[in-house]
Amino acid sequence: HMLQHMLLIYVSAPLIVTGLPPELVDGFLKDRPRLTRGLAFLTHPVAGGLIFTLCFSMWHFPELYEAALRSRPLHVIEHWSMFLPAILMVWPLFSLSTRLPRIGYGMAIFYSFGLMIADLPLWAVLIFGDHPIYETYRLAPRVSELSAAADMILGAVVMKGFNEIFALLCMGYAFFAWYQREK
């Protein structure tokens, strides 16, 4: 299920933002200054990064995690409350809008690095724990030779792997685009 979350966050969200025609976004925001200011605040790198990190981390608290596994409606809310903040998180890197533009190349490098660091506390809890923190997985029948603890660590590695690859690709793109512009 971690792979599903990673695809929502690091593949779907950037594709949605990149695929939004700037004329549509800018035309919609043209006569809506309050909405534009509100969205400018929410898509600011600090706000978007923090909102995403807090929402994503919150769903990994054992009580919320377990509740989402037991309730289909709550699971849908979980996905939306990861996906929509992911849109805010990636907006500064991928926006084509002139009213809510992407950040500059140098800032994109720093922001992407910050995103790599932001999920370290969650990742550390999942990977360095000596026992599984999620009851459902601890009690579930094993479908592979992985123990529940090893399965949790594998999920954390998948999570961090997607985060690192995403951030490094964004940093690399920003660096080389910046270099090309300065040539």
Region spans (language model):
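Alpha-helical membrane segments of multi-pass proteins
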Residues: H1-K183
